[in-house]
Amino acid sequence: MSAYKVSLRELRFFLWELHKTDQHFLTRAPFNDKSRAYYDALLERARAFADELGKAYQASDRQECRLLENGNVEIPKEFHTLWQRYKDEWIQVLGNDSETQQPALPPLIRQTIQEMFMGANPAFMTYGGFNFPAIKLLKLHGTAAQKATYLRKLQRYDWDACFCATEQQAGSDLTAVTTVAKPLENGEYAVSGEKVYISAGMHTLTENTVYFVLGRINTTTSTSYSLSCLLVPRFWPNPETGELEDNHVECTSLLRKMGLKGCANTQLVFGRSGTTRAVLLGDRKNAGLLQLVPLMNQARMSTAIIGLGLASSAYLHSADFAGKRLQGRAISRTSDASAPAVPIIEHADVQRMLLEMKARVEGCRGLLGKLTGASTQAFALEAEPVLDEAQVEKYRKLVLLFTPICKAFVSDQAWKICELAIQVHGVEQAGNLG
């Protein structure tokens, strides 16, 4: 049984009735090559895959990830099959076109599919979860050589990417980052230091992992503006033979969390057992934070969508459970000892909780729709024969405005919705209570 529930009726209402996506966007470039019927069928396919993701979610929390003696990380076994399906069936559908900056899907529709996948199994979705922003970073800032080496591999998800900023002694204080990079020959750098809380930081789903590491080349200053972004592949691609060589990136421990145990949350060490080679993103020193702004915004979006997906599933599970769980008598017969038990959904306080959950879920989805709707509009305007730069800038600024608001508000509301879901469910029936 899947741990995930979704209502396609609600998602279709969001797309076709609230935002009228078919009328406003599917009739305009660059989204006029697919019909509403195509996207309705795509939602059905996404629900079927989300159901499989949901089945693996609870199993992955029980199995957890394990650090092996050889330094490799063992992830839940179900993830390998799911990863191959995700690559084969969904990467091209969800990803950006390799030759242009246009999205493969209208952002509004992409939101609904990501809500299903991230809500069904957020642990699995951390693997390869940084590829999308990594591709964007390389397109924006990478040198020709860096694009030739990394871009296609990341687009095909043959390799994956991770972002490495946090250090044990630093936390969120980037001025305390101590990872350093010393120049080598041929424009390369030797990186040394440790990073913690690196989600999906080591696994065998892909041939290679590219770490985007914040570190210092100039160690005489300790401001956040003296940080550089270094590309550190787990296995160094030999430019002559194409073979992948050990680049001395080690996982020294897996950090424990309350949940999301199927995600390999790693502590990584660079340069301890040998030289860890790196290249500087775009060959630009001390520009790491400026380069990584698009990454931060993508991470905020993902946080909001994960929260929405989990909250929506929690509400739907609660509504289903409340309709089946028999407890208490109808309020009109509370004093009648012979009165039958009724489903708890008939009790006023349970109705209040369910209505509150539904209202919060729809509010969160609607707020995210403001963001993705503005993004969809911006892409459509950019594809117009006569470009209205002022209008494009207006909608791009709206995206920037809504992004941190969505991250903060939706993640906070998701917590409250899931708290109410726990209250509705009460206790899990786990065997003979007598």
Predicted segments, located by residue:
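A short, Trp-centered hydrophobic/proline-enriched beta-strand micro-motif
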Residues: R156-A165
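Alpha-helix capping/hinge segments and adjacent helical runs
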Residues: S2-K5, P183, L260, E393-G434
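C-terminal helix-coil-helix/basic helical segment that borders enzyme active sites and/or dimer interfaces
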Residues: E362-F409, I422-Q423
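A short core secondary-structure module
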Residues: E188, S192-D246
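N-terminal glycine-rich flavin-associated loop
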Residues: T126-A144
